[in-house]
Amino acid sequence: VPLGGPNPIRIQSMTNTPTQDTEACVAQAKRIVDAGGEYVRLTTQGVKEAENLMNINIGLRSTGYMVPLVADVHFNPKVADVAAQYAEKVRINPGNYVDPGRTFKQLEYTDEEYAAELQKIRDRFVPFLNICKENHTAVRIGVNHGSLSDRIMSRYGDTPEGMVESCMEFLRICVDEKFTDVVISIKASNTVVMVKTVRLLVSVMEQEGMSFPLHLGVTEAGDGEDGRIKSALGIGALLADGLGDTIRVSLSEEPEAEIPVARKLVDYITSRRNHPYIPGMEAPDFNYLSPVRRKTRPVRNIGGDHLPVVLADRMDGRMETHPQFTPDYIYAGRALPEQTEPGVQYILDADVWKGEPDTWPAFNYAQLELMETCAAELKFLFTPYMALTREVVACLKQHPEAVVVSQSNHPNRVGEHRALAHQLTVEGLQNPVIFFQHYAEDTAEDLQIKAGADMGALIFDGLCDGIYLFNQGKLSHAVIDATAFGILQAGRIRTSKTEYISCPG
C-alpha cells in the first residue's frame, strides 16, 4: 500500500488488544480493514511482542488480509530491530529511542558533549536502518509532544522547535544513509501545538531539501463529539493546506470506529481538489509558521481582545437552546421571536430593525446606503469575498462599528474566508470577522467533521472573531450550538466546558 506522492491519503488505526494474543489481534485487525483501514499499528512493548508479529501476519494473510502491519516501539531499540524483521513498518519515538527516560532535569551540554550525544543516536540508529533495508521495512519517526527527551528539553524547551529538532536529528541520519522509506509524524493533544509544529517541520524539511511523507493525528483526542471535532480541526487544517499523506483519528472507542470518521474527513477535504482559483493577497504582517491573532477594533464584545463569539439562528421558530451553550447572538431575520432568551442579543434584518433593546441590524453588501444612515453602535455586514468591492471597503472604513460576517459558496470555502480576512488587513481595516459556515447535515458527526475541518485553519491563523454555523438538515439547534462552542474550545480560543484528555492506548 504505497504512501506519499500522488497516492491517496491513507487511513489507519491501532489495535488495543495484547500483541501476544494472536487471535485477538488478528480479529481486531480484520475489523479495522473491513471498516476501510489501510494500515494497522500494534503496540510492541518487548521482544516477545515483536516476534509475535510474525504469527499475526500469518493469521491475516492466510485469510486473505494483506494489510501492512506497523510495530509501535518505545524505549527499547532492540525491540525495533526484531520488529523490523516481521512488520512492514516500525515506528520509533526519538524522545526515547536512545536518550534515557525523562527525569525532567535541566541538563547542560557543551557543543562537544551535545555532538557526542548525537553520535550515540547515529551509532544505534544506523544498524537499525540496515536491518530495515535488508527486510524492505519502512520507518516512521514519530515525535510526541509529551515525550521529548531531557536533552532536547534542556536546549529547546517544550516548544515546537524542540519537537521539530527531535525529528530532524533522525531524518538527517536517514538522508546520510540514503534511507528514504520514511514517514514522519509530530503529534500533540493540543491542536494549536500540533498544527504549528507540523507547519514548522515542513518548512525546515524544505530548507534542508527533504520531502518525506507526513502522518497526521491529534493524540488523546477523546470520544464522542470532542474527539471528532479536535481531530477534524487539527488534521483538517493541515490537509486543507496540502499537508498530510496518512491520518489516524484517535478516539477512545473501538479502533474500527476511527476509520469511518477518518474517511469522511479525507473525502470532505479532497473533494475541493481542482477548485476554481481564488485571487487574493496575503496580509504583509502574516506569519504562517507563527501566526498571531489578527488585529481588530473591538465592537462591543466582538473583536479586539474579546473571546470569539457564537452566532446562531432560529429562523424556523424553534427556540430551544443547549443549557450549557447559549449563543451570544441569535439571528432572527424579519421579526423577533415571541419569547426571547435572557442574556441573548438578537440580530434583525436592517430594513425591519427599529432599535429594540438587545437587538442589532444586519446588512448585506447591497445595502450600503441603508448602513450609512443607521445609527446602531453594532452592525453586521454579511458579504462574500468576491463582493468585497471598493465601495464595500470604503463603507467599512467609514464604519468601524461594522462586524463582517464572511460568507462563501466556493468549493474551497477555507481559502475564500482566508482571502477575505487577509484583504481586510491589506486595506488597513480592523473590522472583526465572523465566519458563516452553512451545511445540510442530518447527523451530528457529519456536522462536527465538516465544520471542524472548515474552521481549523481560520482559527489557527488567528483570523476568527466568531463563528456562525447554519444547518439546513435535521439537527436540533442545541446540537449545532454545542458544535460551534466545541470548535472554539478545540481550537483553544474559548473554553466553555471541562476538557478531559483521554488516551485510547
Please provide the spans of the model-predicted regions.
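N-terminal glycine-rich anion-binding loops that anchor highly charged ligand groups
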Residues: 2-13, 17-36, 40, 46-47
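N-terminal basic/disordered segments at the start of proteins
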Residues: 1-5, 17, 290-319
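Catalytic alpha/beta core domains of metabolic enzymes, predominantly
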Residues: 108-125, 130, 153-303, 387-505
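Short, well-ordered coil/turn segments that N-cap beta-strands
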Residues: 6-9, 36-38, 63-69, 88, ...
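Short, acidic/polar
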Residues: 20-31, 75-81, 167, 231-235, ...
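Short, glycine-/Ser/Thr-/acidic-enriched flexible segments
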Residues: 1-2, 8, 16-18, 97, ...
